Amino acid sequence: MVYALATSDNIYAMKTHLFLGPDKLVNTLKRFGIHGNIPAIPSLALGTYEVSVLELTKAYAILANEGVAISPSIITKITTMDDEIIYKEKPKETKIANQSDVYLLNEAMTSIFDNNLTYNIRPTGVPIRSLLSTTYSAKSGSTDTDNWMVGYNPDIVVAVWSGYDDARNVELSEDTKFGKFIWADSVEAYYRVTGTNPTWYKTPDDVIEIELSPFSGFYAGFGEYTKKLYFRKKNLPWYISLLKEENSNT
């Protein structure tokens, strides 16, 4: 799944969607703040339901906040000329998803920038990797008329849509890349302007990292690229659980 996320290989999204059942994705989207008459159809896994930039940003912010939804606000506080606070926003926090499950996704979505995952196709974030100074989770997406780039870490969430305002097809290959470069410039500018030191997520106690082949998900063969993949300790792949059992019996 890490490779599928990195390269936007949609067959895995479709198979997972059909395996879990269409209603599962509809309910998850609504939990993450995307509402409306969402159709429970197979193509929903491909992003066929229209959402706004704000809706998508709010949904990804839940991942950035480790499973907690925080009500967005334009004004966080108001002060006097003497820096006396006369108003401070008190955002509402709601737990939406399990922290450990979100951590697995956050780690997996960093792979969009991993050039070592280039096999048949290149991960979609590789063209902007050299512009980034720290770790981000991200996902790109596209249709004939839209190009998306959404990414985050514990400090910031940014979503960028690019396309024509008259819904014309985006036909020039150069035009499909603008969103990614705008996104990279935006997230990096945040650190330059604020002087904030980048942070990343602490691995939960019930999560384990294992060095495996990101292409097969199994232990790598000789000379094969390996990557740290993350699992819930209670939900390890069968071959790892079997190996642990064999080792404990020797």
Could you tell me what each predicted segment is?
Residues Y3-A6, S52-K58, I62-N249:
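A penicillin-recognizing enzyme superfamily signal
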Residues M1-N65, L104, A108-S111:
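Active-site-adjacent helix/loop patches that line small-molecule binding or acyl-intermediate pockets
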